[in-house]
Amino acid sequence: IYAVPEGSLIFPREPLVKVVAPIMEAQLVETAILNIVNHQSLIATKAARVCYAAQGDGVMEFGLRRAQGPDSGTYGARAAIIGGCKGTSNVLAGQIFHVPVLGTHAHSWIMSFPDEYTAFKKYAELYPNACILLVDTYDTLKSGIPNAIKVFTKMREAGIPLTYYGIRMDSGDLAYLSKKVRKMLDAAGFPDAVISASNDLDEYLIESLKLQGATITSWGVGTNLITSKDNPAFGGVYKLAAVKAADGTFIPKIKLSENIEKVTNPGNKTFY
């Protein structure tokens, strides 16, 4: 088997994998190769588009709950990191593939406590070195951010280093809210606090938010990434390109079709 290195840029009609084998063995692996290569190339491509739109900001893969089954969620997380994501919320993918596991708490964490401040305070005690607080459970500007600022202030007063901290928003007008949130955090003395966002993001929405001047610097992308929602199938094919003759030379083979896009490129290909 010959293949391009994972993460390589590949163009249409360019071969990704070459299999040299007896015909029966080559046929036996066809379905497995197509299943693996098509799905993970699809997700890696979508991830690359999202990361490009983020213009250097960190992108986290958040899609397991919306993936088409546990395998696609786990292997999709792997592909997303190959495509440029800095980590995944999928802890199984982290265990299997030794990739960074990232994320925040859920709204249910907040709702399980008597009040939002208590929930934030407890989370900060558990994760002082990665304290990202989800601020939109009740009201982002009137409740979430003021309570987050109180927690960050208490941490600073207690001498706890604020190495990686900030907030996440999962709803609302993200451009408007992020600007307000940035001003509130800066005014409170936390200019290096991270502003993270999620909520059905994709490359188009991230680009739009950038153009609107959003102050978001970290993106959690789930459904639209792990399903490649706008283009959910990758059209890779596995075709016979050459047959080895008795004298050791390769005889080119071509698949013809009335549909020009289904005509294959014949001949033994060289992989670099």
Predicted regions and their residues:
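Gly/Ser/Thr/Ala-enriched C-terminal appendages of enzymes
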Residues: 183-188, 193, 201-272
